[in-house]
Amino acid sequence: MADSGRRKRPRVGLALSGGAARAFAHLGVLRVLEAHIIPIDCIAGTSAGAIVGALLAAGVPVARIEDISRNLRWRDVGRMTLSRLGVQSNAPLEDWLRKHLPFTRFEDLPIPFAAVAADLHAGTPVTLSGTGDVPFAVRASCALPGWYIPVADKHGRQLVDGGLVANVPAAAARFLGADIVIAVDVNAEGAKFLGTPRTAFGVLLQSLMVVTRTVSGYQWQDADIIIQPKIGHIRWDELGRNDELRAAGEAAARHCLADIERLLASATQA
């Protein structure tokens, strides 16, 4: 017989937005959640948020994710291609993930995880989870259209960056069974301090940011807590500012910590 006095803890999901280099801010958020023993029962990630989410779901400690991210360069995630569908292939990202993930199958992950991509033809989100190859799914979620070639899945779909349709994957976290969703949106401030991008890659990144900001507001409704690091002054391509981004993530998470703890306490059922 079940103990009638036992209190049931709500299932907590984490939704990590895309944002290229800005995703380093997720690491600061994770550091605060870990320090305050906030439980994470499932994780959904889009684009660069899927990279961080996959590592965390595979059991890689936050400190280790920070260490390996310090050495990450654009050449680690893409290489030039002769394809007419893109300037580069992001197949190297798949190789990088296989090097750092202790588990590469969804069904083996210690924490349930979903990577969100976009179906290029249908214009709809594709939630990759449950079974299958994690590095492939994350690669698809990160395939910035126009720069990286689309990633074809076994169903014949052409998959591209999930930020086009679900940059804040709170709905995917609900799909994984979350009762409470903590979302981290690293693009909430947009690029209010930035001028015109100086490279073609920068133009594509900033164009995607415009699109994601438009749709992100609609996706917030699926989240209970929205953490918004103040990083509007940092471009998506500035990998060298990872320490600053992590610090901003920490500050934003601390700002929301009391609300998170209050929500967890009130949602716990007798």
Please give the residue ranges for each predicted region.
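Patatin-like phospholipase
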Residues: 1-46, 54-270
